[in-house]
Amino acid sequence: MAQVIYYLPGHGGKLDSALGKELMRRGFDIAGRSTTGEFNQLSFSDQVQTIANDLERGFWFEDAKIVANSFGAYLFLHAQALLPPFIGKVLLLSPIVGEFTNDEKMMSFVPPKTDVLKNLVDTGNYPIPINIEMHVGSEDWQSSPDSVQALGTKLGIFYTIVSNEGHSLSKAYVSTVLDRWLL
């Protein structure tokens, strides 16, 4: 029986495409939440609670693995805030960790409840998963490398800023990370 990975894709992502497809190609079964359809219709708080419930009910063991990408990582970080520190392994790729602005592209994004996450981190009350790492591209304008570095430093989380990569980390880089992380 294949090990099941709990996967949270970025906004508008499906479990069986892109990274989910690669995880299945490597022999894993995928569970989690596509960020489309019925799940996407839920309020942010209900999405977060649904993920927290999923983790408590089916993925709360030491060998459990969670992979989250972009906005899926933001959802995970908020779900984790409702739970004790996760005891399995967590991999966050191009994680959205708060609001961002890019003057060059004239784009900005303020995700829901950024103040909740920030306050928990700043007060030392965020329940840090036991085994977590984050990877972000140095040229990522959606997942600010500076914000990922600040979060990683404050919480003592391993992070990597990947030179010359943007929000969509290259398949070659992600493949190398998965080769090591999935062991």
Where are these regions (language model features)?
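Active-site catalytic motif of lipid deacylating hydrolases and related acyltransferases
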Residues: 2-61
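Catalytic histidine neighborhood in serine/cysteine hydrolases
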Residues: 30-31, 149, 153-168
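Active-site nucleophile loop of the alpha/beta-hydrolase fold
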Residues: 35-38, 91-100
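Catalytic histidine-centered segment of alpha/beta-hydrolase-like enzymes
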Residues: 41-42, 165-176
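Flexible "cap/lid" loop of the alpha/beta hydrolase fold
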Residues: 44-47, 95-122, 173-174
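Short beta-strand/loop motif that positions the catalytic acidic residue
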Residues: 127-129, 133-136
